[in-house]
Amino acid sequence: MWGSGELLVAWFLVLAAGGTTEHVYRPSRRVCTVGVSGGSISETFVQRVYQPYLTTCDGHRACSTYRTIYRTAYRIAYRHSPGLTPSRPRYACCPGWKRTNGLPGACGAAICQPPCGNEGSCIRPGRCRCPVGWQGDTCQIDVDECSTGEARCPQRCVNTVGSYWCQCWEGQSPSADGVLCLPKEGPSPVAPSPTPGVDSVVREEVYKLQARVDVLEQKLQLVLAPLHSLASRSPEHGLQDPGSLLAHSFQQLDRIDSLSEQVSFLEEQLGSCSCKKDL
């Protein structure tokens, strides 16, 4: 018994011995019947060729387009000869399709005219699938990722032909994924060498500052002492919080100040009075 590999080799040997692969086509998907009623001849024809090139589109964007040139090519044509009996049907790939990777009988490769540019792939006749960064019927237009919002640059986006890149402010560089701008790593700072006598001076300044802090804490306790006293006396006066007691105390002080002014006024009046002696 032959294996599948041996059968495939034998099949290609038969094709090579026959000198042609036209007879291996059979009516199937993307394979069409070509009626022949005469012999074949070689003829010339004018063939269109599309040459891609880069140009500038609106908005100063780079676009890939094509120019059309014409050249002389050769092809096999079939002519009907008078008096000859029509030959049996022949088969070939339908218009818009060609053989897949040179294999006979398999018409699975689509044909796009003009061809797809910028590494685009022809998925069906006249239809291209464009790679990332390109768009258009033949993948000839550059996608501006910075304007469409597809770019994920944290600070500044720079569009390029078929792609983009992120730019950070001076002193920063983009992260590996391009999402963040990180500070550039510089040389490690060198610790300054200690100067003789500086340690004792700093220690003395620390002691002075600590003494000043202690004095301020004592003054703060003196200022807060009356408030603590008011807070402890608030339940005695039926007040709910120290703030209410403080307001009540201020009212009492206002009354005392008013009485003091009245006493001072009476003292002035008494000083201006004089008693008359009886004669």
Swiss-Prot record:
One of its GO terms (biological process) is smooth muscle cell migration. Residues 28-109 form the EMI domain. It comes from Rattus norvegicus (Rat). It is found in: Secreted, Extracellular space. Residues 200-224, 250-274 form a coiled coil. This is Epidermal growth factor-like protein 7. Keywords: Angiogenesis, Calcium, Cell adhesion, Coiled coil, Developmental protein, Differentiation, Disulfide bond, EGF-like domain, Repeat, Secreted, Signal. Interacts with ITGAV/ITGB3 in an RGD-dependent manner, increasing endothelial cell's motility. The keyword Repeat applies.
